[in-house]
A protein has these predicted regions:
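Extended intrinsically disordered terminal tails
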Residues: 1-148
Length: 148
């Protein structure tokens, strides 16, 4: 009797790793979108603060724009908390977001391919097991030999 041993090489760790990578990418995307929003708001506030230098009465200008000054300070602190000391351009942030979205899409596609392969391997394994069970039944109950 020939015995065939098949090795099914699907690695469930790969599926889990893909899930972890997708979660990491989602987190990074969320962070980058917050940074983008903060940077855009910071630029607007920064313009108001720079305009104070050319205002005829800087003290009155500052009191009229106190909200922008407070927002500027809080945005500056938040951006520093993200490790940003130099404000990146909008294009640079958007490119980073686009790259993350592309990487996430690619990872999702890879995960779907892994799942398809796993399904195929499961079917092959079931068929192989059924075939072995059929052969074992046939071997344990041999057909009676015909006599002449």
């Amino acid at each position: 009797m020939n015995v065939f041993i098949f090795s099914f090489n699907f690695n469930p760790v790969s599926d889990k790793a893909a899930d972890q990578k997708i979660a990491q990418l989602n987190s990074e995307l969320s962070t980058q979108k917050i940074i983008q929003k903060h940077c855009d708001s910071y630029r607007l506030c920064r313009k108001v603060i720079e305009d104070a230098k050319s205002a005829p009465n800087p003290t009155a200008y500052r009191s009229r724009h106190q909200a922008e000054y407070q927002l500027h300070d809080s945005l500056k602190k938040e951006l520093q908390d993200f490790g940003i000391t130099k404000i990146p351009s909008s294009e640079k942030i958007q490119k980073r977001i686009d790259n993350l979205v592309s990487e996430k899409t690619s990872t999702i596609r890879e995960k779907q391919e892994l799942r398809k392969k796993q399904l195929t391997l499961d079917i092959i394994q079931q068929n192989f097991s059924a075939l072995l069970n059929t052969q074992n039944i046939a071997l344990s109950h041999p057909l009676p030999e015909e006599t002449l």
